[in-house]
């Protein structure tokens, strides 16, 4: 094996912004080895943002990482980030209740955990909707671990030219960082 599976040092503390082929924009901050924050800028659940989501992180190649989790909503997510080719592959398993009413989760989830769990329990769960899609990384920055300021507001409060207005250096090559 040409890489150390346990070494997540080049991944933890990074913030990623990516556009799915469907046109949806997501932002992911790998806060530490077991926690992420994220926000959804556009797509069926635009406006959603979450802090301190427990995850499983795995390094599966030299510049290849997997992030997987189950949300209080009943949604399961698995992301593979390829930092060599600047792509993300996402598999999102939405319960039927979210597909039917996505606006119900377009909020700051941390303030609505009991409501999310009640909606999940009320269902319906099936048939599950699988969203299997590629995304292109447009911005990557090193924010360090456990930085509470990386994702600290809803996407609606960000400047129109976000993330390109950030003072942090975009770590992607210029050819990869297109809007």
Regions found by a protein language model. Name each.
Residues 21, 39-41, 70, 93:
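Surface loops and adjacent helix of pleckstrin homology
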Residues 21-26, 48-53, 73-79, 87-89:
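Short, surface-exposed coil-to-beta transition loops
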């Amino acid at each position: 094996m040409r890489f150390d599976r346990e070494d997540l040092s080049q991944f933890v503390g990074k913030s990623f912004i990516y556009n799915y082929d469907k046109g949806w924009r997501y932002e992911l901050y790998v806060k530490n080895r077991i926690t992420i924050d994220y926000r959804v800028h556009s797509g069926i659940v635009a406006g959603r943002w979450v802090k301190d989501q427990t995850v499983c992180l795995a390094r599966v190649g030299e510049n290849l990482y997997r992030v997987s989790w189950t949300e209080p909503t009943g949604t399961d997510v698995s992301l593979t980030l390829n930092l060599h080719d600047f792509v993300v592959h996402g598999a999102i398993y939405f319960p039927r209740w979210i597909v039917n009413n996505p606006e119900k989760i377009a909020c700051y989830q941390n303030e609505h955990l009991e409501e999310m769990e009640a909606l999940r329990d009320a269902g319906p769960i099936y048939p599950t909707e699988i969203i299997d899609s590629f995304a292109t990384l447009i911005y990557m920055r090193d924010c360090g671990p456990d930085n509470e300021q990386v994702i600290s507001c809803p996407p609606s409060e960000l400047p129109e030219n976000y993330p390109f207005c950030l003072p942090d250096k975009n770590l992607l090559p210029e050819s990869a960082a297109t809007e």
